[in-house]
Design a protein with these regions (language model features):
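Extended, low-hydrophobicity segments enriched in charged/polar residues
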Residues: 1-148
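Amphipathic protein-protein interaction modules
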Residues: 129-185
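Alpha-helical oligomerization segments
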Residues: 170-208
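N-terminal low-complexity, intrinsically disordered segments
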Residues: 58-71, 75, 154-168, 204-208
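Acidic-enriched, low-complexity/disordered segments with a strong bias for Aspartate over Glutamate
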Residues: 23, 40, 81, 85, ...
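Aromatic-enriched hydrophobic runs in primary sequence
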Residues: 114-117, 166, 183, 189
């Protein structure tokens, strides 16, 4: 029998950001996935703050509040042609990992792949992990191997380090990536020019 790995923090009930990443993280960061605009056949990223109406806080707003159009409604809007990606974003996750992994103490990093992706074999050496609403195949790797071996067509849905300094959750239903982490890591993410990152209250309800 394959022994399951454990989520790094207890998962509380409810539909809060804390319920996604687990309880007890000192800081919670929401990294917004960009929309895009096509100019001369080339896709250019569009940040939420570029199109958000005056008075709308991108820290607490969902995509529909920012754009005026519901997620997955299949239409364009003023200033953008394609809505943000959901799940692991090839524009976001590599940047996040480059910000976080170099400071990780020696030890393993756990990566999890949602079991709902079609047409995929289970990752080699993975073990099952079930949390409320999701089931993952989780495998251990090193920070170096994860950084050098990223495949934009098959990014992990969850990543956390054995030392317990962070967890990254790129849920398939969300146009943002959620991070539970130490305060120093949160500050680094909020300052990163390659990310549109906002601090969120872990007890606040999840918005899409």
């Amino acid at each position: 029998m394959v022994r399951p790995v454990a989520w790094p923090r207890p998962i509380p009930e409810g539909h809060s950001w804390r319920a996604l990443v687990g309880d007890g993280w000192p800081a919670h960061v929401r990294v917004l996935h960009p929309a895009s605009r096509r100019i001369d056949g080339v896709e250019h990223p569009v940040r939420w703050r570029e199109i958000a109406p005056e008075g709308v806080s991108i820290a607490t707003a969902g995509w529909s509040e920012v754009s005026g159009i519901g997620l997955h409604e299949g239409v364009t809007g003023p200033g953008w042609d394609h809505e943000p990606d959901v799940g692991p974003s090839p524009l976001i996750l590599p940047v996040l990992l480059r910000q976080m992994l170099p400071g990780v103490p020696e030890g393993r990093v756990w990566i999890g792949e949602w079991d709902g992706w079609g047409g995929r074999k289970r990752p080699a050496g993975s073990r099952p992990l079930t949390v409320p609403g999701r089931r993952y195949h989780v495998a251990a790797t090193s920070p170096r191997k994860l950084l050098t071996g990223l495949n934009p067509d098959r990014l992990p849905d969850v990543v956390w380090d054995e030392a317990g300094t962070f967890i990254i959750v790129a849920d398939i239903d969300l146009p943002s990536t959620v991070v539970g982490c130490q305060k120093g890591i949160a500050e680094r993410l909020l300052r990163c020019p390659g990310l549109e990152a906002v601090r969120v209250d872990g007890a606040a309800p999840v918005v899409t």
